[in-house]
Curated annotation (Swiss-Prot):
Role description: Necessary for efficient RNA polymerase transcription elongation past template-encoded arresting sites. The arresting sites in DNA have the property of trapping a certain fraction of elongating RNA polymerases that pass through, resulting in locked ternary complexes. Cleavage of the nascent transcript by cleavage factors such as GreA or GreB allows the resumption of elongation from the new 3'terminus. GreA releases sequences of 2 to 3 nucleotides.
Molecular functions per Gene Ontology: DNA binding; RNA polymerase binding
Top-level lineage group: Bacteria
UniProt feature coiled coil, ranges: 6-75
Family per similarity comment: Belongs to the GreA/GreB family.
Keywords of the record: Coiled coil, DNA-binding, Transcription, Transcription regulation
Protein name stated in the entry: Transcription elongation factor GreA
Pfam families xref list: GreA_GreB, GreA_GreB_N
One GO term of the biological process aspect: regulation of DNA-templated transcription elongation
InterPro entries in the record: GreA/GreB_C_sf, TF_GreA/GreB_CS, Tscrpt_elong_fac_GreA, Tscrpt_elong_fac_GreA/B, Tscrpt_elong_fac_GreA/B_C, Tscrpt_elong_fac_GreA/B_fam, Tscrpt_elong_fac_GreA/B_N, Tscrpt_elong_fac_GreA/B_N_sf
Gene behind the chain: greA
Length: 156
């Protein structure tokens, strides 16, 4: 069976790797210590500290497994340029109705974070912008209507 690739920017890959390393450290030391201390309190059947630590251990182990799976399938997107918008590029766009300018980064769905202006290439905005060049005007359909944007700049 062919492995399904997960495309990530270099920044996205490094972020997931750092989270994995942090969780492994936490699981190995902090949670193990909490479980040990809770065991020392006695009867485990009614020991809420023990149960809470074991539950957290399970959640962390599941996330570690998820991250290891993602990273094993990861392909880092490289070779970006500033001629055409692609995954990983930062894009300066201007709303032609309001004049508002905004810088967003086109990323993979795994890295999307609208609060930090990281927009998935699979989103309505991402689908319209990928492949476009500076100066082009695009129409983006959103729940609140259709918006016209001009692409002012592309950065790596």
């Amino acid at each position: 069976m062919k492995k399904e690739s997960i495309y990530l920017t270099k920044e996205g890959y490094e972020k997931l790797k750092a989270e994995l390393d942090q969780l492994k450290q936490k699981l190995m030391f902090e949670i193990a210590q909490r479980i040990k201390e809770a065991r020392e309190l006695g009867d485990l059947s009614e020991n809420s500290e023990y149960q809470e630590a074991k539950n957290e251990q399970g959640r962390i182990a599941a996330r570690i497994n998820e991250l290891e799976n993602m990273l094993s399938k990861a392909e880092v997107i490289e070779g970006l340029d500033t001629n055409v918008i692609n995954i990983g590029n930062w894009v300066l766009i201007k709303n032609l109705d309001t004049g508002e300018e905004k810088t967003i980064q086109i990323v993979t769905p795994h890295e999307a974070d609208v609060f930090n202006n990281k927009i998935s290439f699979e989103s309505p905005i991402g689908r319209v912008l990928v492949g476009k060049k500076v100066g082009e005007v695009v129409k983006i359909k959103a729940p609140k209507g259709v918006f016209k944007y001009q692409i002012l700049g592309i950065k790596i």
